[in-house]
Amino acid sequence: MVSAGSTINLFGNFRCIVIQKIGELWGGEVTDSLLHKLIVAPPTEDRHGDVYTNAALVVGKFKRKNPMEIAEHLRQALAEVEGVDSVDVVPPGFVNLKCSNEVWYSAIRDINKAGKDYGAVNLGQGQKVNVEFVSANPTGPLHIGHARGAVFGDVLSNLLAWVGYDVTREYYVNDAGGQINTLVESVYLRYKEALGEQVTIGEGLYPGEYLKPIAKALVEKHGDKLLASEDRTAVIREFALKSILDLIREDMALLGVKHDVFTYEADLQRSRTVEKCVEFLQQKGMLYYGTLERPRGVEEEAAWQAREQLLFRSTDFGDDSDRALQKEDGSWTYFAGDIAYHFDKISRGFHDMILGLGFDHKGYVSRLKAAVHALSDGKATIDVKLHNMVNFLENGVPVKMSKRRGEFLTARDVVEEVGKDVARFIMMTRKNDVVLDFDFAKAKEQSKDSQIFYIQYAHARACSLMRNAPTLLPIEDVDFSRVSSAPEIALIKLLVRWPNIVESSAVNHEPHRIAFYLLEVAEAFHVLWGHGSRSVDMRFIVEGDIATTSARIYLVKVVALVISLGLSIFSIAPMEEMR
């Protein structure tokens, strides 16, 4: 009889068993295309059992056979697997398995033995992956939208590194565009103001108060010499860029975010990377001179003048329009610079790239994917993760800011208000492309309304039980059938899902799934704690019953382990005591 095997990765083991049974029943090796579509996972509803698979649907399509008939054959084969209590078939061909309690008892023992390696599946096998995130223009401190992207990129990088990828965290510094000229002009006005002149911050300049300390530092270093200096622009540019990048690095450090590589647009220009990239694409026949149609939304002829220009064949790769690489004055477009930057990434050996962008760049995704495909002959991939805006509230009331007056909440403001760990966790409590409501009052509450508090409280409770427990029986001697109540089994089933959560979060580049999961674990543990508060028989530490106490405390150890592993991916320290 085939066994479900170790419960360290229960769903991974069942996947292997399903693949084995498919091969035995229908012969031949299971193809990669079939494997890619095969799902073996926990069902969304308890009534569908403990494990479900779409194998019959996938094989039915592949073999052109009735999936219900295939499901019945698969049901009979899986019913023979040790640890499987029952197998059901549900139209149009899903197969649902229910495991025996012995599987859950074994899980407690196996997970305790695995310790901190529990869930660390080696998906990446050392493969290089480049995660570019934040990449905010160096014109001011990080606002809260940047902070959301920073936390997302950092947590995703942690997750990918934990599952075996060689991760490079990269920041692209746009230090060669028109916004830098605007920065220089804005700083110069503040410089004159620091020297005692009356100035007016004109429309289109940066009005923020954060420029005043930079201007003051310029005065301390140069006095009034820059007023008449021919090198004024270059001096201010270098000084302002360094000052603001230092400010950005400090803000990211407050959030617990650090990059491995900073790549500068100006350096790529100096090394003529754009020209090399254009030549490369021309040799591949990916560029041509042509005329674009009038963009949608531009109705008047006077607002649009058709002209022949250098275009990238973006539509060959699924984009809705070919894209211009050169402006009328002969300079390169922003998109040309972006193509060149990804040309540089690929030349550095990155064929697996992830890019975090603000949601307002949604229309940019298809052209960027087209460029990466063209540059690599389809060998490189880029996953663009869009992060949506953050709405700030105070007890449900929106916090009003004015961009016109240079008023906005910075990453520093938020960390100083609620702390790094709280800020990081809240940023992960919604899928990255969904608008996030951040309520300062709720964030600081010590209640279930503060999700990170709720999780930390569960961990602290678990640690308290472990500290106060008597010496436990050796784990090999423990009878885990003593943790057989419905809430205990429900908690174990949830804890067994951890490797599956890790894998799905990593494969889909969606680390918010871990936040959702940790909340489920915390809730299930608090429910079990509540049963113990109401019934002596359900307490974790049972006076005079070391056998039951040992079984329950080993379960508590798994709760603490899983919460600490999840929080470590978020770079949040688990709390052993609540103060």
UniProtKB/Swiss-Prot annotation:
Q: Which SMART domains match?
A: Arg_tRNA_synt_N (SM01016), DALR_1 (SM00836)
Question: Which molecular-function annotations from GO does this UniProt entry contain?
Answer: arginine-tRNA ligase activity; ATP binding
Query: What GO cellular-component annotations does this UniProt entry give?
Result: cytoplasm
Q: What does the record give as the reaction this protein catalyses?
A: tRNA(Arg) + L-arginine + ATP = L-arginyl-tRNA(Arg) + AMP + diphosphate
Q: Where is this motif: 'HIGH' region?
A: 136-146
Which GO BP terms, alphabetically? arginyl-tRNA aminoacylation
InterPro entries, sorted: aa-tRNA-synth_I_CS (IPR001412), Arg-tRNA-ligase (IPR001278), Arg-tRNA-synth_N (IPR005148), Arg-tRNA-synth_N_sf (IPR036695), ArgRS_core (IPR035684), DALR_anticod-bd (IPR008909), Rossmann-like_a/b/a_fold (IPR014729), tRNAsynth_Ia_anticodon-bd (IPR009080)
Against SUPFAM superfamilies, the record matches this protein to:
Anticodon-binding domain of a subclass of class I aminoacyl-tRNA synthetases, Arginyl-tRNA synthetase (ArgRS), N-terminal 'additional' domain, Nucleotidylyl transferase
PROSITE patterns (alphabetical): AA_TRNA_LIGASE_I (PS00178)
Q: Please tell me where this protein is predominantly located.
A: cytoplasm
User: Could you say which EC number(s) this protein's record lists?
Assistant: 6.1.1.19
Instruction: Give the highest taxon in the source lineage.
Output: Bacteria
Task: State where the protein is found.
Answer: Cytoplasm
Query: Which keywords fit this entry according to its UniProt record?
Result: Aminoacyl-tRNA synthetase, ATP-binding, Cytoplasm, Ligase, Nucleotide-binding, Protein biosynthesis
HAMAP family (UniProt xref): Arg_tRNA_synth
Subunit info? Monomer.
PANTHER family annotated for this entry? ARGININE--TRNA LIGASE, CYTOPLASMIC, ARGINYL-TRNA SYNTHETASE
* Family statement: Belongs to the class-I aminoacyl-tRNA synthetase family.
Q: What is this protein called?
A: Arginine--tRNA ligase
